[in-house]
Amino acid sequence: MAWVAWFTGLPGCGKTTIAKCVKLNLIKKGIDVKILQLDEIRRSITPKPRYTEEERDIVYASLAYMAKLLSEAGVNVIVDATANKRIYRARARELIPDFREVFIRAPLDVCMAREAERITEFSPKGIYKKASDEKAAVPGVNVAYEEPLAPEIEVDTTKMDPAQSARFIAERLSNPEK
């Protein structure tokens, strides 16, 4: 059975950038990994997302189940998803035998600045602006983001750049006893 590392943090904290770098670091170590990016998968589950509480419940449960199936097939998985409520991550932990929570920490103002500059294919852009206009429910602004209480791995992206964060995380994922 393979492991699942769930990257959580506010939108714009660097989850996607770091996840891609971690994957490259792990491949160099001979460890194959698949990234499940919520922003990409959400479009299959909810083609016209409304980001409601009910929709989030369905999307996060589906994502956790996909990760479980892949890990049972021997595929290591990085889940790139905010999962703003602890219960979403707790349910995934209950479902997946080798679950590792990875907290990508960054203050809201830093996340907002990064998100405003975001260039991406799948991740929504301008979500913090929409939240300030009350057009969207955004974790950290008008919907709570519940930080992990005891993540297996934590990085602060105001203290480490993406490459440093990725090396730190990849080392812990490849040697969990560290």
Q: Language model features by range: what are they?
A:
Residues 16:
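Walker A/P-loop
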Residues 32, 73-77, 100:
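Loop/turn-to-beta-strand initiation segments
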Residues 11:
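The conserved Walker
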Residues 105, 114-168, 176:
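Small-molecule kinase domains that catalyze NTP-dependent phosphoryl transfer to phosphate-bearing small molecules
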Residues 4:
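Walker A (P-loop) ATP-phosphate-binding motif of ABC ATPase nucleotide-binding domains
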Residues 19-68, 72:
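Conserved substrate/cofactor phosphate-moiety recognition/catalytic segment
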Residues 7:
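Hydrophobic anchor at the beta1->P-loop junction of P-loop NTPases
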Residues 80, 95-115, 155:
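Conserved phosphate-donor/acceptor-positioning beta-strand/loop module used by diverse small-molecule
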